[in-house]
């Protein structure tokens, strides 16, 4: 789940949900 935190912190929460 480290990648999720990195993406969410880099692009934002919306990006994390889109990736998931």
Swiss-Prot record:
KW Protease (keyword) present: yes
First-tier enzyme category under EC: hydrolase
EC number from the UniProt entry: 3.4.22.34
Catalysed reactions, as listed in the record: Hydrolysis of proteins and small molecule substrates at -Asn-|-Xaa- bonds
Top-level division of the source organism's lineage: Eukaryota
Protein's GO biological process: proteolysis
GO MF, any single term: cysteine-type endopeptidase activity
Record's keyword terms, sorted: Hydrolase, Protease, Thiol protease
Family classification: Belongs to the peptidase C13 family.
The protein's name in its UniProt record: Hemoglobinase-like protein 1
The species this protein was found in: Fasciola hepatica
């Amino acid at each position: 789940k480290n990648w999720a935190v990195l993406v969410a912190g880099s692009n934002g929460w919306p990006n994390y949900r889109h990736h998931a």
